[in-house]
Design a protein with these regions (language model features):
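Amphipathic alpha-helical scaffolding segments comprising HEAT/armadillo-like alpha-solenoid repeats
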Residues: 2-16, 35-48, 69-82, 101-115, ...
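Preference for long, well-ordered alpha-helical segments
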Residues: 142-151, 159-165
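General structural signal for alpha-helix termini and helix-helix connectors
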Residues: 50, 116, 131-134, 150, ...
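Short N-terminal amphipathic alpha-helix/helix-capping patch enriched in small hydrophobics
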Residues: 9, 24-25, 40, 56
């Protein structure tokens, strides 16, 4: 398939994802399985966040949990930063972990989400960071450790403090790699 016809198909899928007709949306979601376009990640997350249809949510979650396209990490991180996705941020973090993405350059962002987010979001961030196999830049780890220490000391009674302490321990153990 030529690049222009592939782009046209992706644009058609995007249009159908937001058609408002559940049957058309489901067909568009199913078409996404045959595409390896990173430009579909954010629209799929938007559909996931906005649909009331459990079947559509399940299909989208399955796609995003198993996504293997170049630059998916950037699309997920952009979606995490989008305030419109606040109610599904835990799910986006889960998609990152399930898809095997190694966000080594974004450890600080994940640490800040763990601190500022819900308990469930903090747990997802811990899981992602614990399972990173790739080398993480030392300065990112040191910055995350500093931010976590500050958060833990300033919020000792926060229900997430134990979880944040676990994250701190994971990050500190990674400093031994240097």
């Amino acid at each position: 398939m030529s690049s222009s016809s592939k782009n046209k198909l992706v644009e058609e899928i995007k249009k159908d994802l937001f058609s408002g007709d559940d049957v058309v949306v489901m067909k568009a979601v199913l078409k996404c399985k045959d595409q390896d376009s990173v430009t579909l990640v954010e629209p799929l997350i938007a559909v996931y966040a906005s649909t009331g249809m459990p079947e559509i949510r399940r299909e989208v979650a399955d796609l995003l949990n198993n996504i293997k396209v170049p630059n998916a990490e950037q699309a997920f991180l952009k979606a995490l930063a989008n305030k419109q996705n606040a109610k599904v941020r835990k799910d986006i973090l889960s998609f990152i972990w399930n898809s095997g993405i190694q966000p080594t350059e974004h450890i600080v962002d994940l640490t800040e989400i763990a601190i500022d987010g819900s308990f469930e979001e903090a747990l997802e961030c811990l899981t992602i960071i614990e399972n990173i196999d790739d080398q993480v830049p030392e300065e990112k780890i040191l910055e995350s450790v500093s931010v976590l220490r500050s958060a833990i000391s300033s919020q000792p009674n926060d229900p997430k403090t134990g979880l944040l302490a676990d994250l701190l321990s994971v990050l500190e153990s990674r400093t031994e790699e240097f």
